[in-house]
A protein has these predicted regions:
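Glycine-rich anion-binding surface patch
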Residues: 1-121, 125-149
Length: 149
């Protein structure tokens, strides 16, 4: 199982926004090699607190697990998004949770799915799986940065 698939599973299991998961997603999908080097240099020189500070500063407040708009930026170019929100006023009475399901599909019919407590979490999971599929198929470099999966 790839690092990106593990991140997708973490997004699906989250019960709400997770800043530490946002940071890990950013490092694995969005960060440039130079940004990853800056974070690692901070970690080596000053520890994990400095590394987290550097990531937070470079991310500029983006929260993939909290914001549907932010999660949409993770979807690879040319992929289509389908979102389903299974929020139901009867769900708590039946012991069910609210659930979002997201699928992203490429024109050549490669499709992946994610689910989560919110649509942002579901879409983040699906987008991570899309990146993993691209890397596995050789259409995206295996590791765009030092933190890649």
């Amino acid at each position: 199982v790839s690092d990106l698939e593990k991140l997708a599973e973490r997004a699906e299991q989250a019960s709400g926004p997770r800043p530490e998961l946002d940071a890990t997603i950013w490092l694995n999908v969005v960060a440039t090699p130079e940004q990853v080097k800056t974070v690692e240099a901070g970690r080596k020189a000053h520890g994990d607190t400095e590394a987290r500070f550097r990531v937070e500063r470079m991310m500029d407040g983006v929260r993939y697990t909290a914001s549907l708009d932010a999660a949409m930026t993770l979807v690879p170019d040319g992929w289509h998004i389908d979102l389903r929100d299974y929020a139901d006023s009867r769900a708590p009475l039946a012991g069910l949770k609210q659930m979002g399901v997201a699928s992203v599909k490429q024109a050549d019919l490669l499709a992946v799915v994610g689910s989560g407590e919110t649509l942002a979490l579901a879409l983040a999971a699906a987008a991570l799986r899309a990146h993993a599929a691209l890397r596995d198929s050789g259409r995206q470099p295996q590791a765009e940065n030092a933190a890649g999966g």
